[in-house]
Regions:
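Short, conserved catalytic or interaction motifs in soluble domains
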Residues: 155
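Beta-strand repeat architectures
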Residues: 1-35, 41-55, 63-127, 133-152, ...
Length: 214
C-alpha cells in the first residue's frame, strides 16, 4: 500500500507493507486498539492520533517522521530509523528488544523495559522534555546516544539502566536527567565513548554514577 498524500485511517491490519512515500502522511486515528503485523517503509510521515494503543509487531524500515500526538505507541518489533516526536500525555514503549531510531523530541513518556537498550542516532539537535522511564531495580532500561547531534534531556527521568554517549552530546541541567540513581556505586553507569556530557546548569552528579571512558 503506497501512501503518496495525506491519508487518515481508522484501522489497519495485516502483514503487508505500507510504503510512506516522500510527501505522504498516514494518520491512524481511532479509539480502538490497533495491532499491525506488517511493516512501514519509506521517508514519509506516520502520525498516531486517538486515545487507543497502536502496537507494531514488524521489522519496520521507515526513516521519515513518527508523531505520537495522542494515545500510546507500543513497538514489539523494530520501529526503524525514524525521527520520533511524542506529545505530552502519550507514551512510546520499547517492547521488542534493543532498537535504534532517529531523534527523540517532545514532552511525552518513553518506557524502556529492563535489559533493553534504546539507541537514538541523529545528527540533529533536539530537546526531549518528557520522562524516560522503566522498571526500578539494578537492571533497568538503557539509553545510548550516537550521531553528531545534541540531545537535551530536560525532564526528570526515572529509567534505572545505563547511559552511553557514543557520539554528539547529551545536555542536562540536573542529575535526574540521567535517570534513577543506582543504590551503590555502579561501574559503567555513565559511559563516554566518543561523545560528550554537557552540564547546562550547576549541579552535583551523584557519585554512584561511576563514569567510564571508552
Amino acid at each position: 500500500y503506497d501512501v503518496r498524500s495525506s491519508i487518515t485511517l481508522e484501522s489497519l491490519s495485516g502483514t503487508g507493507e505500507v510504503r510512506l512515500s516522500s510527501g505522504g502522511t498516514l494518520t491512524l486515528d481511532s479509539s480502538s486498539d490497533i495491532s499491525f503485523n506488517g511493516i512501514f517503509s519509506g521517508q514519509g510521515a506516520l502520525t498516531k492520533e486517538g486515545s487507543n494503543e497502536l502496537t507494531l509487531l514488524g521489522t519496520n524500515t521507515h526513516y521519515g517522521s513518527t508523531n505520537v500526538n495522542t494515545g500510546n505507541l507500543t513497538v514489539k518489533g523494530f520501529l526503524g530509523n525514524t525521527n520520533l516526536t511524542i506529545a505530552a500525555g502519550s507514551t512510546y514503549s520499547v517492547e521488542g528488544g534493543d532498537d535504534t531510531i532517529g531523534f527523540i523530541s517532545g514532552a511525552g513518556n518513553i518506557h524502556i523495559p529492563s535489559g533493553v537498550t534504546l539507541t537514538t542516532s541523529t545528527n540533529s539537535n533536539t530537546n526531549f522534555s518528557g520522562v524516560i522511564s522503566g522498571p526500578s531495580g539494578d537492571i533497568g532500561g538503557n539509553l545510548t546516544k550516537s550521531g553528531n547531534g545534541n540531545l537535551t534531556l530536560s525532564g526528570i527521568n526515572t529509567y534505572a539502566g545505563s547511559t552511553t554517549i557514543r557520539g554528539g552530546t547529551i545536555s542536562i541541567s540536573a542529575d535526574s536527567g540521567l535517570g534513577a540513581v543506582p543504590g551503590s556505586a555502579t561501574a559503567g553507569h555513565l559511559t563516554l565513548n566518543g561523545g560528550t556530557l554537557e552540564a547546562k546548569a550547576s549541579f552535583t552528579l551523584n557519585p554512584n554514577r561511576e563514569i567510564s571512558l571508552g
